[in-house]
């Protein structure tokens, strides 16, 4: 019996948590829908503000336009253009609250020109003023003007949802977003602002923005005699960090190994001009490894009954095959096949 009661209580708690989640999501969506509805209403106002009767009588048009400006006809035109047919949430909100919009149009507009504030916040109460949250529109941490002290986002800000907790921007931490995250330091603090800036890339923790303000150095950096974190040049270490067919490229805090050019046997950098020695099939010409044209060498690289074809770093020999004309007379030789050497 006790076990059954415990299970029932647990079920109730889970159900309440789920309902709370749905409630929050509903109010966030409702506020968004209301905001969109008001935005569309404002667009309708702009669109209908320039109605042209085209009668040619300016005085007559001014009288008609003056009447049209606050008329039921104009309101109807605006309402008909509010919600797209596929937007069920907007259509449902409009259907339930059309009388409120009519009341604002005919009785409240002059005294309450801000439709969003009057309709979404004060009348149907699905939104809150900026800088407040929740069912009672409580003020966010840090105040309505600068929620989370301007360094984060207040949960539920501007809606009847949320718990008001701060989600701090990058570089900021703490319940009130008044602390700097790891890797950042406080560069400005007064009654109005609290500013965090990123540490120098060489630092693990810092008190300022240069490599002289590091508490510790990151891997790949080391402190010099003056206490500044400087890059370690891994490329000058012995033994070398890269293989014989690679060259070392030092970077800030690290290094990388790059493949040598195909014309090189060992290298100290990129390209054929950085070779330590030239690979087979290449020769050094004024400090750059270039292709050897084996087909021009003496003695010849191919036999007398072969054609020589030079390639980059190598060559091939093609067998000569007798060629004949249409009358059967021999006209010369043509290549038959390739033999890579």
Swiss-Prot record:
PROSITE patterns: EGF_1, EGF_2, EGF_3, EGF_CA. GO terms for cellular component: endoplasmic reticulum; extracellular region. FU repeats lie at residues 193-248, 254-308. Keywords: Calcium, Disulfide bond, EGF-like domain, Endoplasmic reticulum, Glycoprotein, Repeat, Secreted, Signal. One of its GO terms (molecular function) is calcium ion binding. Residues 1-24 form the signal peptide. SUPFAM superfamilies: Growth factor receptor domain (SSF57184). Possible role in neuronal acetylcholine receptor transport. This is Cysteine-rich with EGF-like domain protein 2. It comes from Danio rerio (Zebrafish).
């Amino acid at each position: 019996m006790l076990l059954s009661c415990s299970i029932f209580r647990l079920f109730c708690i889970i159900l309440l948590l789920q309902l709370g989640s749905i409630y929050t999501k509903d109010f966030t969506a409702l506020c968004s829908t209301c905001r969109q509805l008001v935005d569309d209403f404002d667009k309708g106002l702009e669109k209908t503000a320039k109605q042209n009767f085209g009668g040619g009588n300016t005085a007559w048009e001014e009288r008609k336009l003056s009447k049209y400006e606050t008329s039921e006809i104009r309101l109807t035109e605006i309402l008909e253009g509010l919600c797209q047919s596929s937007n069920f949430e907007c259509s449902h909100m409009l259907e339930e609250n059309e009388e409120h919009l009519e009341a604002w149009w005919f009785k409240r507009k002059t005294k309450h020109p801000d439709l969003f504030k009057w309709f979404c916040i004060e009348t149907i109460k699905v939104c809150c003023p900026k800088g407040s949250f929740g069912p009672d529109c409580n003020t966010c941490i840090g105040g309505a003007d600068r929620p989370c002290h301007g360094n984060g986002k207040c949960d539920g800000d501007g809606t009847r949802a949320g718990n008001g907790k701060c989600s701090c921007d990058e570089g900021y931490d703490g319940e009130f977003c008044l602390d700097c995250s790891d890797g950042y330091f406080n560069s400005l603090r007064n009654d109005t602002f609290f500013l965090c800036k990123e540490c120098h890339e060489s630092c693990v923790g810092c008190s300022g923005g240069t490599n002289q303000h590091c508490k510790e150095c990151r891997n790949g950096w080391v402190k010099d005699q003056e206490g500044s974190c400087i890059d370690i040049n891994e490329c000058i270490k012995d033994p070398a960090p890269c293989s014989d067919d690679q060259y070392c490229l030092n970077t800030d805090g690290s290094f990388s190994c790059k493949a040598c050019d195909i014309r090189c046997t060992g290298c100290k950098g990129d390209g054929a001009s950085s070779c330590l020695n030239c690979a087979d099939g290449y020769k050094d010409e004024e400090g750059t490894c270039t292709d050897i044209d084996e087909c021009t060498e003496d003695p010849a690289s191919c036999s007398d009954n072969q054609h020589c074809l030079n390639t980059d770093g190598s060559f091939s020999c093609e067998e000569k095959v007798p060629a004949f004309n249409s009358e059967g007379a021999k006209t010369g030789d043509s290549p038959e096949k390739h033999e890579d050497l």
